[in-house]
C-alpha cells in the first residue's frame, strides 16, 4: 500500500510538474493564439481560395508564419515589442497599406490575380502576397484581442525563468494550431471544388454555376472585407483631436493646493499591455523643466501637449511660446529602442519667425501619442465640499526602494520619481552617498523604529498615569490641532484639506503679499543670485544640449545644495503661490564666462519678474459642470466656463420677472437672471458625454453597439443578459405561452357573457392606453431627432418663424380677401369685419422647446440653439359665412369649446398639431358647409319632384286595379264551367276508378310493410352502448316512421271498407263475404303481434339505461359512505382527546394571563371556515397528522424549568442535531428546554488576547455588517444567518448564559465582489481604514468573514425576560446587537439601484398568511415578558383576520405623531388590522405585543426620522385611521392627501426640543436595543453638529454671506443649513395640475389683457384656480402638504473620533448593575457635553455607589487614531524582542480561565477580582497576518507610493513567531 501511494504521489507530482512547465504553458498560449483570427487570415484564405500558383500559396504561408514569429520574438525582445506595440505603428503601417491595397485590387489595370506562367520569385505579385501576410500578421486581432493574450504573456514572463523556451514553445503551439486550421480549410475548399454546381433549390433558381461565379467575384469580396478592416482600424486609431488646454488656477487654489498633485483616475486606451518597464521608459518625458505659459492664444493654433507622469497622473507641459525673443522651438525625437540613455532632445536653432511653426511637436507625437491627455478623463467630486478629492490610478513600475530597512524591488514605484532620481544621480556624481550594507541598513531601521516606539509608549504611559491621578478626561485625551480659516468666526478648514490632519495634503497656506506690492529693489537685488542658481540647475539637468556642455566644469558642486536652498527661498519671497520653472532658452543670453551684459541684464530681469509672477498650469481641482455654471451666472459671481461635459441639458426659462416685455431677438441681461424661473430639460438620448472633462482624450469605445436612434443607455453587448428586454429577445414569453396553451385552458373553463364583455372593455382601454403611449414615444422620438441633428434647431426655428409670419400676414389675409370678393361676385354681402375680428383674435405665442408659453413678442433664450415652439391661440378658421348671434352657435358655447381645442401648435410645414411634434390635425374645410348647404337645396328639389311622381304612381295603380278586377270576373266564369264538366265525368266513370284504386292500395301496403320490418331489423343490430346517443336518435326516427306507416294502413283499410265491401254486396249477394272475414281476422292478429314486437325493440334501450342509473344512484353512495362515516367518528374522537389534553395542559400552566384562555391552533388545517375565527368555543375539524413541530416546542416552552428538567436527558444529544431547523433548536435552547450542545459545537477559545475577548463581549461595539462587507470587498448579500448557542453548566434556571453570535456571510458561492463605491472623499478614507484595523481580530476564522459576538445579559436568577432578541427572524436585516444609528444610514445602502426604497427593510420576504390565524409571537420565536416582577409571561394570540384587502388603499403607514405619555391610547399602529385590545394597550407595552424589530426601528425613527425607509415601514390598509393628531404638531390633512413621514422631519424643526424631552420620558419603553439606538443618536447628533458646521460654512461661502430679508429666503437658508441637500417634490395628485398652472401663469404675466385667456383656460379645464397658493411660507406649504422636503441622505462621516466616542460610551457592565426591571433602568440619554456625563454614567453602571473608580475600557483611545495605529504596528515590527505581543498571564493561564468571567458573568465568586480587573488596562493586540500589514501600511503611515487595493505592495517583514 505504501508503495502504491508513493507511486501514485510521484505520478501526480510528475503530472503537475508537466502541466506547470514552461513548455506546456507556451504550447497552450500558442494554441490560444491560433484562434486570434485577424485580417492576416483573409490574405491567407485568399491565396488558398483563388486559383493561383503554388508559389503564391507558399509565399502566403511563409509570410504568415514569419509575421507570427516576429510577434512571438517581440515578446522577448523589448525594442521590437515597443516598435510593434505602439498604436501609431498600427495606424501608420496598416491604414495606408490597406487603402492602397483596396484601390489597387479594384482597378483592373493595376494588378492581375489570375494565373501566371512566370515561375520566378521576382514576380511582383508573389512578393506582394508575402508582404500582405507578413504585415497583417503584426496587427491586432479581431476575435480574441491581443491585449488579453499580451496580459497572459506579461504575467507568465514575469514568473518564468527560461523566457526563450517559453517563446519557442508558444510559437510551436501556434504552428501546430495553424497547420490544423489550414488543413481544415483545405478540406473545406476541396469539398467545394468537387461540387462545382450546387443542385437547384426552390429558393435559388438557375444557380448551376454559383460556385464558379463566387470564385470569380472572390477578389471583390476580399476587397470589401479589407475595406471593413480599414474602417475598423480607423475607429481604433487615437485620432489627432484638437484638445483644450488646462485652465488657469486662481491664487487661492494655488495656495491651498501646493501639494495637490493627487488622484485623478485615468482610463487608458492602450491596446497592447506590453512589459510595463520598457513601455514606461520608452515614453520618457522631456527632462528639461520647460516654462508653461497660460496666455490666451489664437484659436487657429493647436494646443498640443506632451505628458509628464507624476504620481500616476499625466501632467501637461505647454511649450513656452515666447513673445519677446527669437523662438527656438524644441523637437522631441524618440528612439523607440527602450533605452533610457538614447532618448535625446535636439534643439534646432532656426532663426525664422515663430509663426512659421504652428506646432512644436514631432509629427508622430502630434498624431499618434495615444497617452496624450491634456487632462484626466474622469472627475470624481465630493458632494460635501466644493473642491474635488481625487483618486489616483495605480501604476506599475519596477524600481528598488528601501523598505523595512532593506533594499527591495517595488513594482508600484512612481515612474516620474524614478526618472528624476536617475537623472540627478547620473549628473551629480558627488552627491551619491556611500552605500550601506544591508545589515547596517536593517540595524538602523530597527533602531529608529525602536526609538519611535518608545517615544509613543512613553507618551501613552504618561497619559494613562494622568488618568490614574484623576485628571479630567478631556485634558488627557490627545487633542487634534486644526487649521482655522478665520479666527474670529472660528471656522476650521475641511478635514480633507487640513494639512495638520492628512500628510499627503500638507502644504503651506500662508497669506503672503502679492507680487504687485513687492519692492522692486528686492527683486533687482536677488536677480543676480537667481540667475546663477538657475544657470546651475539647468546646467545639471540639461547637459545633453551642446550649447551648455562647456558649462559643467564651472559649477562648484559642494555649494549646490546651499544654492538650491537659497534659490527656493528667494523665489518664495517673490511669489508665495508656487515655484515656477524657467525657460532654458533665456539662458542663451549668458556669455561664455558667465557675465551678463547691461542691456541684456535689464531685459532678463524684466523677463524673470514677468515669468516668476506667472502661474504654472496645474490640475484644476475646481471644475464645474454646466448646471453649476448656470447657477453661478445667477449669483453675484464671475461665471466660469464649465469644464465637465455633463448630460445634454437645456435651461428652459419659463418666467422672467423683468417688469417689461423684452425685444424680439434679444436675450435677458445678467441683472434680470436672478429673478428667472427656469427648468432644466435633459435630452432623452444616450449620454455619451458621461461627465468627461473637456479636452480629455476619449477612450475609443469599440465594444459599444447602438442599434436604435433612441437608446437609453449605451452599453456593451456583453451585458445583454442584464437587460430586461433586448432588441433580439423582445417577444413576450408569457403571451406566447398563453397562445400555446389556450386550448388546454379553455377546456375546463366556462366563460360567462359578463366576463367576456368586461374583457373586451379592458382590452379596448388597454389598446387606447397603448396607442397614447405609442403616440407619446413617437413625439419624443421626433423631438430628439430634431435635437440631435446638427443645425436642425436653427433650420426648424427659422422655418417656424417664417411659417408663422406667412400664416398670419400672408395666407390668412389673402384667404379673407378671396372669400369676400367671391361673396360679392355671388351677390352676397361681404363679411370683412367678422373675418378680421377672428383674424385678430389669433395669437402666436412663442414657447420653449417643451411647449412652455412665454409671450407673443419674447423669444426664448437661445431659441436658435435650444429650439422653439409656436403655439397658436384661437386659431383662425375661414368660414364661408358667419351666423347671427341668435343661431345655434350661441346656444351652447361651452359645448363647442369643450369639443374643439382653442389652441394648436404650428408645424414646420405650416400645419396645425394638437401637441408639439404631434401628427397634423384635420382642418375644418371651407367648402364643407357650402356642400352641406347645396345638399340641402338638392334634397328640397328632390322632395318636390318625388311628390309629383307619387301622384302619377297612384293614378297608374288605380287603372291597373280596375283592369285586374274585370279579368278576375272572366276567369271565375270559365272555371265554373270546367267544374261542371268534371262532375259529369265522375258520375259516368266511377266504377272503373274504384277497382283500379283498390289494387294499387294493396300493392302499396305490401311494399310499405316489408320496408318497415327491414328497417327495424337494421336498427336492432346497430344498437350499442358506446354510441347510445346515436342509437336513441335513430330509434326516435324509427318510432315516428312506424306511427306514420300505421296511420297510412288504417286509412287504407277504412277506404277499403267504404268502397270495396259495399260494391261486393251490391254485385253478388252470396256467402263470399263471410269467408273473406274469416281470412281477415288471423291476418289482423299477426299484425298486432308485429306491432308489439316493434314497440318492445324500441323501448329496450331506454329500459337498460334506466336500470343502470338506478343502481348507480342508490347503491353506490351507501357503499362509499360506510368507511367515511367510520373515519369521521374515529377522527372526531381523537380530536376530542387531543383538545382535552391541550386544555388540561394549559390549565396547569403557571402564570398564564386570565384573559387569554382560548386555544391557539397550530394544527395546519385543510378547510377552515372564516366565520369560526372569532368563535372561541367552536370545534374546528383538523387533520392531526400534520401537527407541526413548532406547536410541540411552543407548548414545551410554556412549561416551567423544573418540569422540563427531566426532558433534558432525552432532548440533549451529542451526535448530529435531531432538529431539521436550527431555529427550533436555538429557540428551545434559549428557553432552557434542553442544553443545545452537540459535538460540532464551537468551543470558546480562551487562548485569545484580552482585546479580542473584550470586543467579542461588547456587541454594541460591532460595526455594521455592510461596513465589514465593504472592508473585505464582498457584497452584502440578502440574508444574515445568525447562530446563537447557550451554555448552562451550573444553574438549572439559566441564571446567566452566553450567546455566541455567528453572523455568517454567504460567501462560499458568492464571489460577486462589490468594488468600493466611488466615494472618493478623503474624509471617508481615514475612517474606513480605521475600521480596517479592527477587522483583523477575526483572522482565525477560515470559512469567511464573520463576527463572533457574545452579548452580555445578566439576570438575578429569574426567568429571562427576552426584551433583547435572542433570535432575530431571518426575514429581517437589522441585527439587534448593532446600534441602529450604524445600520440605517443611507451611506451603507449598496443595492440602491435595484430598489431605492428598500434600505434593508424589504417586506417582500415577509410572507404573512392573511387568511389564517397566526400567532405572530411564536412565528417569530420571540417570547414576551409583561411583568418581570410577577415572573409571568403573556402571549397575545388574538388577532383579527383580514378577509379582504381593499386594493384601492395605499399600503403605507404614516407616522404623524410622537408618543405622548399623557395620551397613550391614540391610534398609533394599526398593523394589518389587529384587534382593538392591542391597539388600546398602553404604549409601555408596545414592544411586548409588537415585533421587536419594529420597535427598534420606531425608536430610531422617533429620534432620527430621516433614517427610516421612504415608503414601506408597515402595511396599513385602513385609511381612515391614518389621520392622526398630535399635541405638538397641529397638522391637518385633506381628503386623499397624506405626507410621507420623511417630511415629518422638516416639521420637527419648530419643536425639536420638546420632542426630545418626550423621547427622554419614554424610559419604560426602552429595551437594550432601544438604548443603543438612543446612544447612537447621541453620538450621531454630535457628529451631525460637526457636519452642520461644515455645511454652514460652505453655504456662507457659496452665497457670499448675503443677508436674507424675506421670510421665504430665511426659511430656505435654514433648511439648507440643516440638510445641505434636499429635494422638493409635489405630491402626485397635484403634479400635472401644477405644471399646467405654471404654464398658464407664465403666459398671463406677459399678456396685456389676460382676462380673456384666463377665463378660457379655466373653462377648458387647463387652469384650476382652487389650488392657487398665494404668499405661503415654506412651513405653511409643508403643513398643507403641497411641499414635501425629503433630505438626500448625507454621507455619514465616521472617523477615528467617532469610533473613540462610540468606544468610550460602552461600559463594562457588572452583573449586579445590569437590571432588566424597567424601574431600575438607567436613562441613556447623553447631552451635548457628553464626555463628562458619559463617564459619570459609567461610574454608576460599572462601580457601585461607594466606588469612584472607572475606566475607559480601551485605554488606547486616549491617543489619536493615527498614533494608536502607529504604536500598534511598531510593536508588531519589534524584531529584536522574541515576545512580539505583550500578553497578560492572567488571561493566558489555562488554570485561570475563570477570570474571563468578567465578560461572561458565569460565576458569582468573581466579585473579589473586580477591582483588580477594572484597573487592568486592556492593551493586547493579535498577531497580524503579513498580508494585512501589507494592505494597511500605506494608510497607517500615510505613504503615497502605490495603488489602493488593486495590487498591494508585498512587504517581506521578519517572520513573526506565532504561539
Swiss-Prot record:
GO terms for cellular component: chloroplast inner membrane. Pfam families: Ycf1. Signal peptide: none annotated. Residues 256-268, 295-306 have a biased composition (Acidic residues). Keywords: Chloroplast, Membrane, Plastid, Plastid inner membrane, Protein transport, Transmembrane, Transmembrane helix, Transport. Residues 247-314 are annotated as: Disordered. It is a multi-pass membrane protein. The keyword Transmembrane applies. Residues 273-284 have a biased composition (Basic and acidic residues). The keyword Transferase does not apply. One of its GO terms (biological process) is protein transport. The chain crosses the membrane at residues 18-38, 64-84, 87-107, 124-144, 172-192, 221-241. It is found in: Plastid, Chloroplast inner membrane. It comes from the Eukaryota. Involved in protein precursor import into chloroplasts. May be part of an intermediate translocation complex acting as a protein-conducting channel at the inner envelope. There is a partial copy of the N-terminus (positions 1-399) of ycf1 in the inverted repeat (ABQ45296). Part of the Tic complex. Belongs to the TIC214 family. This is Protein TIC 214. It comes from Buxus microphylla.
Amino acid at each position: 500500500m505504501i508503495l502504491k501511494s508513493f507511486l501514485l504521489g510521484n505520478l501526480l507530482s510528475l503530472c503537475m510538474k508537466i502541466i506547470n512547465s514552461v513548455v506546456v504553458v507556451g504550447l497552450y498560449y500558442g494554441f490560444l493564439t491560433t484562434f486570434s483570427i485577424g485580417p492576416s487570415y483573409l490574405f491567407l484564405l485568399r491565396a488558398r481560395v483563388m486559383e493561383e500558383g503554388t508559389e503564391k500559396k507558399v509565399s502566403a504561408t511563409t509570410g504568415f508564419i514569419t509575421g507570427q514569429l516576429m510577434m512571438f520574438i517581440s515578446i522577448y525582445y523589448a525594442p521590437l515589442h515597443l516598435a510593434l506595440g505602439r498604436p501609431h505603428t498600427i495606424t501608420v503601417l496598416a491604414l495606408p497599406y490597406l487603402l492602397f491595397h483596396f484601390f489597387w485590387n479594384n482597378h483592373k489595370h493595376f494588378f492581375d490575380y489570375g494565373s501566371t506562367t512566370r515561375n520566378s520569385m521576382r514576380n511582383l505579385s508573389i512578393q506582394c502576397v508575402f508582404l500582405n501576410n507578413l504585415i497583417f500578421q503584426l496587427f491586432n486581432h479581431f476575435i480574441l484581442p491581443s491585449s488579453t493574450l499580451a496580459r497572459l504573456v506579461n504575467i507568465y514572463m514575469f514568473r518564468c525563468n527560461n523566457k526563450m523556451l517559453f517563446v519557442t514553445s508558444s510559437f510551436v503551439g501556434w504552428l501546430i494550431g495553424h497547420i490544423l486550421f489550414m488543413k481544415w480549410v483545405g478540406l473545406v475548399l476541396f469539398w467545394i471544388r468537387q461540387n462545382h454546381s450546387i443542385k437547384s433549390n426552390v429558393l435559388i433558381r438557375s444557380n448551376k454555376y454559383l460556385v464558379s461565379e463566387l470564385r470569380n467575384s472572390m477578389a471583390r469580396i476580399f476587397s470589401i472585407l479589407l475595406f471593413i478592416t480599414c474602417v475598423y482600424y480607423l475607429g481604433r486609431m487615437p485620432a489627432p483631436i484638437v484638445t483644450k488646454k488646462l485652465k488657469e488656477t486662481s491664487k487661492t487654489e494655488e495656495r491651498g493646493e501646493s501639494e495637490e498633485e493627487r488622484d485623478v483616475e485615468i482610463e487608458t486606451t492602450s491596446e497592447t499591455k506590453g512589459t510595463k518597464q520598457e513601455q514606461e521608459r520608452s515614453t520618457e518625458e522631456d527632462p528639461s523643466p520647460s516654462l508653461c505659459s497660460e496666455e490666451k492664444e489664437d484659436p487657429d493654433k493647436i494646443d498640443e501637449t506632451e505628458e509628464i507622469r507624476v504620481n500616476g497622473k499625466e501632467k501637461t507641459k505647454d511649450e513656452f511660446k515666447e513673445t519677446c525673443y527669437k523662438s527656438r522651438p524644441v523637437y522631441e525625437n524618440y528612439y523607440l529602442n527602450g533605452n533610457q540613455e538614447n532618448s535625446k532632445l535636439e534643439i534646432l536653432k532656426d532663426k525664422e519667425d515663430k509663426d512659421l511653426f504652428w506646432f512644436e511637436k514631432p509629427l508622430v507625437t502630434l498624431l499618434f501619442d495615444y497617452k496624450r491627455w491634456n487632462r484626466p478623463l474622469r472627475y470624481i467630486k465630493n458632494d460635501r465640499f466644493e473642491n474635488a478629492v481625487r483618486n489616483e490610478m495605480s501604476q506599475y513600475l519596477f524600481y528598488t526602494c528601501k523598505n523595512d530597512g532593506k533594499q527591495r524591488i517595488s513594482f508600484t514605484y512612481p515612474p516620474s520619481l524614478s526618472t528624476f532620481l536617475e537623472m540627478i544621480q547620473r549628473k551629480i556624481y558627488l552627491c551619491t552617498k556611500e552605500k550601506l550594507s544591508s545589515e547596517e541598513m536593517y540595524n538602523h531601521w530597527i533602531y529608529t523604529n525602536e526609538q519611535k516606539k518608545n517615544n509613543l509608549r512613553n507618551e501613552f504611559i504618561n497619559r494613562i498615569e494622568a488618568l490614574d491621578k484623576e485628571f479630567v478626561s478631556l485634558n488627557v485625551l490627545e487633542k487634534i490641532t486644526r487649521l482655522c480659516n478665520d479666527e474670529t468666526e472660528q471656522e476650521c478648514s475641511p478635514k480633507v484639506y487640513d494639512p495638520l490632519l492628512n500628510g499627503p495634503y500638507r502644504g503651506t497656506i500662508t497669506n503672503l503679499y502679492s507680487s504687485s506690492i513687492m519692492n522692486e529693489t528686492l527683486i533687482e537685488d536677488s536677480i543676480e543670485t537667481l540667475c546663477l542658481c538657475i544657470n546651475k540647475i539647468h546646467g545639471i539637468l540639461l547637459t545633453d544640449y551642446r550649447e551648455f556642455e562647456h558649462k559643467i566644469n564651472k559649477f562648484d558642486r559642494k555649494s549646490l545644495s546651499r544654492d538650491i536652498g537659497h534659490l527656493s527661498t528667494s523665489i518664495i519671497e517673490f511669489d508665495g503661490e508656487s515655484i515656477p520653472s524657467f525657460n532654458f532658452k533665456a539662458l542663451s543670453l549668458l556669455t561664455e564666462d558667465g557675465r551678463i551684459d547691461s542691456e541684456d541684464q535689464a531685459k532678463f530681469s524684466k523677463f524673470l519678474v514677468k515669468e516668476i509672477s506667472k502661474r504654472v498650469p496645474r490640475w484644476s481641482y475646481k471644475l464645474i459642470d454646466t448646471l453649476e455654471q448656470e447657477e453661478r451666472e445667477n449669483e453675484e459671481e464671475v461665471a466660469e466656463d464649465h469644464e465637465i461635459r455633463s448630460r445634454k441639458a437645456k435651461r428652459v426659462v419659463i418666467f422672467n420677472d423683468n417688469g417689461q416685455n423684452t425685444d424680439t431677438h434679444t436675450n435677458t441681461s445678467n441683472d434680470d437672471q436672478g429673478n428667472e424661473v427656469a427648468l432644466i430639460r435633459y435630452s432623452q438620448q444616450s449620454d455619451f458625454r458621461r461627465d468627461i472633462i473637456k479636452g480629455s482624450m476619449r477612450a475609443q469605445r469599440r465594444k459599444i453597439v447602438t442599434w436604435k436612434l433612441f437608446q437609453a443607455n449605451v452599453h456593451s453587448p456583453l451585458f445583454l443578459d442584464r437587460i430586461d428586454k433586448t432588441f433580439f429577445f423582445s417577444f413576450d414569453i408569457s403571451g406566447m405561452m398563453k397562445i400555446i396553451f389556450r386550448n388546454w385552458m379553455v377546456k375546463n373553463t366556462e366563460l360567462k357573457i359578463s366576463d367576456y364583455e368586461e374583457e373586451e372593455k379592458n382590452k379596448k382601454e388597454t389598446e387606447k392606453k397603448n396607442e397614447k403611449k405609442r403616440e407619446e414615444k413617437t413625439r419624443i422620438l421626433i423631438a430628439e431627432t430634431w435635437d440631435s441633428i446638427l443645425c436642425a434647431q436653427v433650420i426648424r426655428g427659422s422655418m417656424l418663424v417664417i411659417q408663422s409670419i406667412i400664416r398670419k400676414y400672408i395666407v390668412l389675409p389673402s384667404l379673407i380677401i378671396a372669400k369676400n370678393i367671391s361673396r360679392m361676385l355671388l351677390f352676397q354681402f361681404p363679411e370683412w369685419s367678422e373675418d378680421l375680428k377672428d383674424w385678430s383674435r389669433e395669437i402666436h405665442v412663442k414657447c420653449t422647446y417643451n411647449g412652455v408659453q412665454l409671450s407673443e413678442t419674447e423669444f426664448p433664450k437661445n431659441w436658435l440653439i435650444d429650439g422653439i415652439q409656436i403655439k397658436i391661440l384661437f386659431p383662425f378658421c375661414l368660414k364661408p359665412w358667419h351666423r347671427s348671434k341668435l343661431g345655434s352657435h350661441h346656444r351652447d358655447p361651452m359645448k363647442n369649446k369643450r369639443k374643439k381645442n382653442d389652441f394648436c401648435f404650428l408645424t414646420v410645414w405650416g400645419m396645425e398639431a394638437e401637441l408639439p411634434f404631434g401628427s397634423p390635425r384635420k382642418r375644418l374645410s371651407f367648402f364643407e358647409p357650402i356642400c352641406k348647404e347645396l345638399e340641402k337645396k338638392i334634397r328640397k328639389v328632390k322632395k318636390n319632384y318625388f311628390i309629383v311622381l307619387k301622384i302619377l304612381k297612384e293614378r297608374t295603380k288605380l287603372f291597373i286595379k280596375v283592369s285586374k278586377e274585370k279579368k278576375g270576373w272572366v276567369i271565375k266564369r270559365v272555371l265554373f264551367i270546367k267544374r261542371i264538366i268534371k262532375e259529369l265525368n265522375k258520375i259516368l266513370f266511377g266504377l272503373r276508378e274504384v277497382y283500379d284504386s283498390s289494387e294499387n292500395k294493396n300493392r302499396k301496403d305490401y311494399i310499405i310493410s316489408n320496408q318497415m320490418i327491414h328497417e327495424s331489423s337494421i336498427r336492432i343490430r346497430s344498437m350499442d352502448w358506446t354510441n347510445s346517443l346515436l342509437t336513441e336518435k335513430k330509434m326516435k326516427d324509427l318510432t315516428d316512421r312506424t306511427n306514420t306507416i300505421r296511420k297510412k294502413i288504417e286509412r287504407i283499410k277504412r277506404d277499403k271498407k267504404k268502397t270495396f265491401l259495399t260494391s261486393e254486396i251490391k254485385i253478388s249477394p252470396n256467402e263470399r263475404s263471410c269467408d273473406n272475414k274469416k281470412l281477415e281476422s288471423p291476418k289482423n292478429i299477426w299484425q298486432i303481434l308485429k306491432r308489439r314486437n316493434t314497440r318492445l325493440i324500441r323501448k329496450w334501450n331506454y329500459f337498460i339505461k334506466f336500470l343502470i342509473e338506478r343502481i348507480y344512484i342508490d347503491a353506490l353512495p351507501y357503499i362509499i359512505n360506510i368507511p367515511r362515516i367510520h373515519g369521521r367518528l374515529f377522527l372526531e374522537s381523537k380530536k376530542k382527546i387531543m383538545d382535552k389534553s391541550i386544555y388540561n395542559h394549559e390549565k396547569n400552566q403557571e402564570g398564564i394571563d386570565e384573559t387569554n384562555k382560548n386555544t391557539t391552533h397550530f394544527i395546519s388545517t385543510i378547510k377552515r371556515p372564516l366565520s369560526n375565527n372569532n368563535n372561541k368555543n367552536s370545534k374546528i375539524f383538523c387533520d392531526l397528522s400534520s401537527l407541526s413541530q413548532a406547536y410541540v416546542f411552543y407548548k414545551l416552552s410554556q412549561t416551567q424549568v423544573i418540569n422540563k428538567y427531566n426532558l433534558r436527558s432525552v432532548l440533549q444529544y451529542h451526535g448530529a442535531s435531531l432538529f431539521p431547523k436550527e431555529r427550533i433548536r436555538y429557540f428551545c435552547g434559549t428557553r432552557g428546554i434542553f442544553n443545545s450542545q452537540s459535538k460540532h459545537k464551537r468551543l470558546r477559545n480562551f487562548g485569545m488576547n484580552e482585546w479580542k475577548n473584550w470586543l467579542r463581549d461588547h456587541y454594541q461595539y460591532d460595526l455594521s455588517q455592510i461596513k465589514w462587507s465593504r472592508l473585505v470587498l464582498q457584497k452584502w448579500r440578502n440574508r444574515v444567518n445568525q447562530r446563537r448557542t447557550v451554555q448552562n453548566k451550573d444553574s438549572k434556571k439559566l441564571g446567566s448564559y452566553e450567546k455566541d453570535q455567528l453572523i455568517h456571510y454567504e460567501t462560499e458561492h458568492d464571489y460577486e465582489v462589490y468594488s468600493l463605491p466611488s466615494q472618493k472623499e478623503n474624509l471617508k478614507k481615514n475612517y474606513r481604514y480605521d475600521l480596517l484595523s479592527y477587522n483583523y481580530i477575526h483572522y482565525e476564522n477560515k470559512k469567511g468573514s464573520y463576527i463572533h459576538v457574545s452579548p452580555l445579559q445578566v439576570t438575578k436568577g429569574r426567568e429571562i425576560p427576552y426584551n433583547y432578541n435572542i433570535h432575530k427572524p431571518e426575514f429581517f436585516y437589522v441585527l439587534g446587537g448593532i446600534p441602529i444609528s450604524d445600520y440605517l444610514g443611507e451611506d451603507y445602502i449598496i443595492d440602491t439601484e435595484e430598489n431605492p426604497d428598500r434600505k434593508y427593510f424589504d417586506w417582500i420576504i415577509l410572507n404573512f398568511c392573511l387568511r389564517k390565524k397566526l400567532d405572530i409571537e411564536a412565528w417569530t420565536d420571540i417570547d414576551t415578558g409583561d411583568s418581570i416582577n410577577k415572573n409571568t409571561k403573556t402571549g397575545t394570540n388574538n388577532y383579527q383576520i383580514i378577509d379582504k384587502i381593499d386594493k384601492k388603499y395605499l399600503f403605507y403607514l404614516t407616522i404623524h405623531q410622537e408618543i405622548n405619555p399623557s395620551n397613550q391610547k391614540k391610534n398609533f399602529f394599526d398593523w394589518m388590522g389587529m384587534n382593538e385590545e392591542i391597539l388600546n394597550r398602553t404604549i409601555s407595552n408596545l414592544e411586548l405585543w409588537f415585533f421587536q424589530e419594529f420597535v427598534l426601528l420606531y425608536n430610531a425613527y422617533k429620534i432620527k426620522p430621516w433614517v427610516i425607509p421612504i415608503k414601506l415601514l408597515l402595511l396599513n390598509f385602513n385609511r381612515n385611521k391614518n389621520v392622526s393628531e398630535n399635541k405638538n404638531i397641529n397638522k391637518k390633512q385633506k381628503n386623499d392627501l397624506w405626507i410621507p413621514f420623511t417630511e415629518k422631519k422638516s416639521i420637527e424643526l419648530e419643536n425639536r426640543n420638546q420632542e426630545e424631552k418626550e423621547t427622554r420620558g419614554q424610559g419604560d419603553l426602552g429595551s437594550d436595543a432601544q438604548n443603543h439606538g438612543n446612544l447612537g443618536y447621541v453620538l450621531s447628533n454630535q457628529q451631525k453638529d460637526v457636519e452642520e458646521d461644515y455645511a454652514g460654512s460652505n453655504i456662507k461661502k457659496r452665497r457670499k454671506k448675503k443677508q436674507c430679508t424675506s421670510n421665504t429666503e430665511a426659511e430656505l437658508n435654514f433648511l439648507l443649513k440643516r440638510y445641505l441637500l434636499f429635494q422638493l417634490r409635489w405630491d402626485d395628485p397635484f403634479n400635472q395640475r401644477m405644471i399646467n398652472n405654471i404654464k398658464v401663469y407664465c403666459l398671463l404675466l406677459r399678456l396685456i389683457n389676460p382676462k380673456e385667456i384666463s377665463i378660457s383656460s379655466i373653462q377648458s379645464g387647463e387652469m384650476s384656480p382652487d389650488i392657487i397658493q398665494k404668499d405661503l411660507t415654506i412651513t405653511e406649504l409643508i403643513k398643507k402638504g403641497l411641499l414635501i422636503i425629503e433630505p438626500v441622505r448625507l454621507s455619514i462621516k465616521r472617523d477615528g473620533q467617532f469610533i473613540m466616542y462610540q468606544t468610550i460610551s460602552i461600559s463594562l457592565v457588572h452583573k449586579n448593575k445590569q437590571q432588566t426591571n424597567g424601574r431600575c433602568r438607567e436613562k441613556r440619554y447623553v447631552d451635548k457635553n457628553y464626555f463628562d456625563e458619559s463617564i459619570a454614567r459609567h461610574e454608576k453602571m460599572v462601580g457601585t455607589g461607594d466606588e469612584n473608580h472607572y475606566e475607559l475600557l480601551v485605554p488606547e483611545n486616549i491617543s489619536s487614531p493615527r498614533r494608536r495605529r502607529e504604536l500598534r504596528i511598531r510593536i508588531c515590527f519589534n524584531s529584536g524582542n522574541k515576545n512580539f505581543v505583550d500578553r497578560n498571564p492572567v488571561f493566558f493561564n489555562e488554570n485561570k480561565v475563570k477570570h474571563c468571567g468578567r465578560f461572561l458573568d458565569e460565576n458569582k465568586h468573581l466579585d473579589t477580582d473586580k477591582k483588580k480587573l477594572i484597573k487592568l488596562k486592556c492593551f493586547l493586540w493579535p498577531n497580524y497576518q503579513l498580508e494585512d500589514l501589507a494592505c494597511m501600511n500605506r494608510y497607517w503611515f500615510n505613504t503615497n507610493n502605490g495603488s489602493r487595493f488593486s495590487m498591494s505592495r508585498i512587504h517581506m517583514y521578519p517572520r513573526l513567531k506565532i504561539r
